[in-house]
From Swiss-Prot:
Protein name: Small ribosomal subunit protein eS8
Example GO BP: translation
Subunit structure, as described in the record: Part of the 30S ribosomal subunit.
Organism field: Methanosarcina mazei (strain ATCC BAA-159 / DSM 3647 / Goe1 / Go1 / JCM 11833 / OCM 88)
Family as reported in the entry's similarity comment: Belongs to the eukaryotic ribosomal protein eS8 family.
Signal peptide region: none
GO MF term list: structural constituent of ribosome
Claim: Phosphoprotein is one of the keywords in the record: no
InterPro entries: Ribosomal_eS8, Ribosomal_eS8_CS, Ribosomal_protein_eS8_arc, Ribosomal_Se8/biogenesis_NSA2
Matches recorded under PROSITE patterns: RIBOSOMAL_S8E (PS01193)
NCBIfam families cross-referenced by the UniProt entry: eS8 (TIGR00307)
KW ATP-binding (keyword) present: no
Gene Ontology cellular component terms for the protein in this record: ribonucleoprotein complex; ribosome
């Protein structure tokens, strides 16, 4: 779990004395770490009675060609580069900004698979 409350340190590095402890609503969740495999989704209930779709596994992506604006669904072969974490390349984990290899060509992921429940990508040269 990840705590998403405000920092206990000032900009100068000094400590802020907390007036209260941590609260449950400040708590985050584990990241989805979307892998390349058959499609597997999970619904998560969020604050306000809303819902998020976590994409746990997927082997397809909606790839848009920026030159002609056409979108095609293609299978994902592998992850080439990931700026979020260099170890995600070896584990084939998809995040926003990761570069993937597909039969259509090399593409950069533009959606957040763990938040949106779908993989959208743009072809790169």
């Amino acid at each position: 779990m990840r705590w998403q409350g405000s920092s206990r340190r000032k900009a100068t590095g000094g400590k802020i004395i907390a007036a209260r402890g941590k609260r449950k609503f400040e708590m985050g969740r584990e990241s989805a770490e979307t892998r390349i495999s058959d499609v597997k989704r999970k619904n998560v209930h969020t604050m306000g009675g809303n819902r998020k779709v976590r994409l746990l596994q997927s082997n397809v992506a909606n790839i848009t060609n920026p030159k002609d604006g056409k979108t095609v669904t293609a299978t994902i072969e592998t992850v080439i580069d990931n700026t979020a974490n260099k170890h995600y390349v070896r584990r084939n984990i998809l995040t926003k900004g990761s570069v993937i290899r597909t039969p259509v060509g090399t593409a950069r992921v533009t959606s957040r698979p763990g938040q949106d429940g779908v993989i959208n990508a743009v072809l790169i040269e």
